[in-house]
């Protein structure tokens, strides 16, 4: 487990991505980092991820005034900004396992005190070959957050309060 940091950061050509729709922009940027995936796969995965589930508003810039915009990050399926990563990651995991000919079950462990749990459960629910267990502190989430996690449907999910 842990976090991975690249040895160097690729330079993103801002002019090349200006004007792209969010799924295209996401695929272009992610492709700079995840070079083991084909650009075609990333484009398809981003389109599938940020399309209908985000109501056509992934990366929506809401005008505040003539020159000020607000980036709205709550248009995902759980209304949490974490949907942006946790809806794409399962597709990346399944593709990586396929490319590496890995067939064993994968267990995702998540610890949360709030929105991450629901976003992770929603993203990974019913993904073949993947189990997810979400741990949360008893009394450490809001009642709404607890209910969001507890009512998530899926055959491969475990929710554990500690």
Question: Where does each model-flagged region fall?
Answer:
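Well-ordered mid-protein domain cores that form the structural environment of catalytic cofactors
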Residues: 69-126
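A structural signal for isolated positions on well-ordered beta-strands in alpha/beta enzyme cores
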Residues: 107, 131-133
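Conserved small/polar residues in nucleotide/adenosyl-binding loops
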Residues: 160-162
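Hydrophobic, small-residue-rich alpha-helical packing segments that form membrane-like cores
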Residues: 133-144, 154
């Amino acid at each position: 487990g842990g976090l991975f940091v690249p040895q160097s950061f690729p330079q993103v050509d801002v002019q090349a991505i200006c004007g792209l729709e969010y799924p295209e922009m996401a695929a272009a940027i992610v492709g700079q980092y995840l070079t083991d995936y084909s650009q075609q796969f990333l484009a398809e995965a981003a389109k599938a991820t940020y399309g209908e589930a985000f109501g056509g508003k992934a990366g929506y810039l809401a005008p505040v005034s003539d020159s000020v915009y607000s980036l709205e990050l709550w248009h995902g399926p759980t209304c949490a900004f974490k949907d942006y990563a946790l809806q794409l990651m399962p597709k990346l995991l399944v593709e990586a396992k396929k490319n590496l000919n890995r067939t064993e079950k994968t267990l995702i462990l998540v610890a949360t005190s709030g929105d991450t749990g629901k976003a992770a459960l929603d993203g990974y629910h019913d993904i073949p070959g993947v189990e997810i267990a979400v741990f949360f502190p008893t009394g450490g989430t809001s009642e709404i957050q607890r209910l969001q996690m507890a009512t998530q449907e899926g055959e491969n999910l475990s929710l554990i309060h500690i």
